[in-house]
Amino acid sequence: MKTVQLLESSKFDLKKGGKAVYLIEGKEKEEELLKPKEVGLNLPFKFLNPLQSVFFKHYEGGNALISSPTSSGKSLISLLFYLKNKEGRFIYTAPTRSLIWEKFREFKGFFGSVGVRSGDVVEELQNISQKAVVATYESLVAAARNRSRWFEEAGALVIDEVHVIRDEGRGAIIEELVSYALEEGIPLLALSATVPGALSLAKWIEAELFIDSRWRPVPLERRIYNLRKLLKRVKSSPQTPQEKVVSALEALDLKGKTLVFLPRKDLGWQALEVENAFYGKKVVNETLPFEVQPKKGEKVAFHNADVPQEEREKIEEEFREGELNRLYATQTLAYGVNLPADSVVIFVRGRFDRFSLEYKFFPDLLTILQMEGRAGRLGLSEKGFSHIVITGAKEDALEEALKEEMESSFKTALSQGLNSKEGAACQNRKKSILSLMLLGPVLRYGTSWKKAVKDFYSVRENPLLLKELELIVEELRELGFIEGDKPTSLTKLLVSSFVSPYCFIEFLKRLKSTTSLREKEPTIGYLFTVRPFLRKELNPKTVALFTKEAFTQEGERIRELLEEESGIEVNDNSEVLIFYGKGSFFDFKNVARPPGELSTLSTESSLLGQLLCKLNLFDFEVVHRVIMSVRGGIPFNFSLLASVEGLGYMRGNALARAGKLVGAPNETSLINAVKEEKEEVLEALKEVLAFRYSSLKVLEKEFNQIVNIVKKVKFPLGNERLLKFLSSIFVGREEALKIDKEKALEVLRENVKGEEEV
């Protein structure tokens, strides 16, 4: 393996060029930067940067790992990698849909046409014929497991953000993808943020070239402050933690775009409230755990996993291109979102551990380094600034710990052992993750599955893990999910939907024990039954943050009802899904959209629909209502309102509540009544809206918009894209693209009749 260390002393200017300074075989070298034409690329800039130049000069084929700071031009390196591996299809994979679509736009200019697999249902209907494909990790691993043609023709594979392998939830998928690349001999380029022990990662992927880059396109200046000392600069006397955070920022007096990383999400919301109430800032967020005051000052926002996805995307765009200059965030923003800033401010808590005799920090040291990676905007900032504000430890203790962190060994979540976690869809979360991890290779290689699994980094580091996997295979064989050495057709179906056999067992248990509940309370009964098929954690703390005691009380009532009716102990956060599915967020004026993971259930509902159609345990009328209730958060009897464009969660639930008030049996009856302008229904809708809107003017506007949307509705109801996707199960992809919504519904009703038995 050739190892290159790109040094900080490298220089780069977009117009003037610069130089690459690096160490190779213990010798320091200095070279001029390459021009795009020299490497066969037609690009709108004059020079490749030092990292790109060094990669092109030293990469001669095979696998490679690049470990470098954020925003150092790794995307272009993907194309340079392709130029030396032109045989076969070029595949780029990353963890998030936003990154996938960002790369789609970048690569389109080079390849002309680019295939996409981001989890969207319509994409699955399109056959991939393009030379290049961008895909999320999950879409790519599904293609690999099923031997999809576009994966089998891979000639070059780029795994971006490969450091996500350290994550408990998704790390196993990256290990699986790398094992397939190694097994099939697919040239692999792994792109990583700066991580400790990256050399171990390079050895694992059998890299011919490893570049460890210390160079940043925009130089970083780090400053560490003690919070107590910093607050002496301000005239006010802040008392609460959130007041201290905002006062510290005022003391720093930063200009330009600033990301403020906080160790706790509640502190983020509280700081936002202080900014709004006492500093006159205008809050960009719409879904909030407090009542916002209308202000006209500078914009401010908070970004974390609790914020609805649609709002997160708006906030990101406003920070990139708009007038939003101060954005509070938690550590989720440090990974997977391309959002550079002029400055980052990182609030860190430290404590001295008497057992290890060393300081512990939160957020952890690697996350702090990732957060620093957001500092500096190429072409806009001459320098990026990292301001670390610490409590509970001395400044030099943190500085020393950050240096030592980069010298530690590389670890993954699997190699260290998985933790049990409340809220998992199955009783045994660890078995569930491990079963899916091994069933992928079993699906692809049959009896040779061990050979691929032995290539997993975690198995190499922890050989006892292989023994655990062997025991799980034996158990799955006893349970009937593996016959001989082959997974059954049911097992293949489950794995293609990312559902473990253990989750399926839990589903069957609920199916048998909720018959009466599904008849009496269909929203509660069906959502509880299918909950094991949904991968999301559905954190109750997120819901409680926005709804306070109301959810705590309602959640307890839901759990008691479920346990009484089914005899099953509820510990998978089913109450969150049911609270959402009943439309309960409508009662909270501070909530514009369902928060957190509840705003990202579209892909989950599509996979759920595919699985339920293939299982054929319910007729399609039931399946359709269940998946739309999951997708849109509208009660079972009115859930098809979720397919009406322009309604969304709040308007859909306003209609559903009006329908319930007048005794409408379903959404079709309700829609017809609105179209016919039946006074009883229209008055009921106004009554429902009056609960949410105190302004008569706003109420009338919302009422008129809902009525206008409903009057344009055409029957039959249903999301055409989703229905075509589901119908493709029975008529094939090409035919599904040709048929209309009516025909798709006809196909589904003919084939999904609930005739199978378990």
Locate the predicted segments by residue:
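Conserved C-terminal RecA-like helicase domain
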Residues: 69, 91-120, 254, 259-326, ...
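Conserved segment of the helicase C-terminal RecA-like domain
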Residues: 343, 358-403
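Conserved helix/coil segment N-terminal to the catalytic DExD/H
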Residues: 121-155
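Conserved interdomain linker/interface between the two RecA-like ATPase lobes of SF2 helicase motors
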Residues: 179, 195-275, 301, 305
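C-terminal helical accessory/scaffold domains
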Residues: 461, 470-653
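SF2 helicase catalytic motif II
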Residues: 138-139, 147-188
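A short beta-strand element within the Helicase C-terminal
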Residues: 326, 332-350, 384-389
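Helicase-associated low-complexity/disordered flanking segments
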Residues: 1-54, 61-64, 269, 280-297, ...
